Every structure is written in C-alpha cells, then in structure tokens.
UniProtKB/Swiss-Prot annotation:
Gene3D superfamilies: Photosystem II cytochrome b559, alpha subunit
GO MF annotations, alphabetized: electron transfer activity; heme binding; iron ion binding
Protein name: Cytochrome b559 subunit alpha
Family designation: Belongs to the PsbE/PsbF family.
Entry keyword annotation includes Isomerase: no
Record's keyword terms, sorted: Electron transport, Heme, Iron, Membrane, Metal-binding, Photosynthesis, Photosystem II, Thylakoid, Transmembrane, Transmembrane helix, Transport
High-level lineage: Bacteria, Bacillati, Cyanobacteriota, Cyanophyceae, Synechococcales
Record's cofactor remark: With its partner (PsbF) binds heme. PSII binds additional chlorophylls, carotenoids and specific lipids.
Cofactor: heme b
Protein's organism: Synechococcus sp. (strain JA-2-3B'a(2-13)) (Cyanobacteria bacterium Yellowstone B-Prime)
The protein's assembly and partners: Heterodimer of an alpha subunit and a beta subunit. PSII is composed of 1 copy each of membrane proteins PsbA, PsbB, PsbC, PsbD, PsbE, PsbF, PsbH, PsbI, PsbJ, PsbK, PsbL, PsbM, PsbT, PsbX, PsbY, PsbZ, Psb30/Ycf12, peripheral proteins PsbO, CyanoQ (PsbQ), PsbU, PsbV and a large number of cofactors. It forms dimeric complexes.
One BP term from GO: photosynthetic electron transport chain
Underlying gene: psbE
Amino acid sequence: MAGSTGERPFVDIITSVRYWVIHALTIPALFLAGWLFVSTGLAYDIFGTPRPNEYFTAERQELPIVSDRFNALEELERLTR
C-alpha cells in the first residue's frame, strides 16, 4: 500500500484559481523580461558575446576558425587582430 507524502495532488494545483491567478501574471512577466534582456543588448554585455554586427569586421571577413592545434595561440593572436 502506497503512503502519502503530504503534498497536494498535481490535479488539485492546476485546477485551482489561485494557481492560474499567480501564473497568469508571472509567465508573461518572465517572457517580457527575457525579451527585454536580449533586445536591449544587456545579454551580450553580461555574457561577453559579440553582437551580430560584430562577428566580422571590415578588415577581417573570413571565418575565425583555428585549424592548427599545435599553433593555436599564434592563430588566435592573428585572428583577433
């Protein structure tokens, strides 16, 4: 015979009005916060990734791929100039 964990059944939670009042506000707020985080460029600044227009500069149009694993430092220095 299975014992009870003392928690509310999942069906009771998702059919309650309180659940939907809380989540009707928080889910759209999280979506909006994420959209603002990315669209303002703050995500690029925090994580240090280049913006889409910064991948290729006017001087360097080739792909920055390291192909020689034994001389990787020299290649990285050449690619980042």
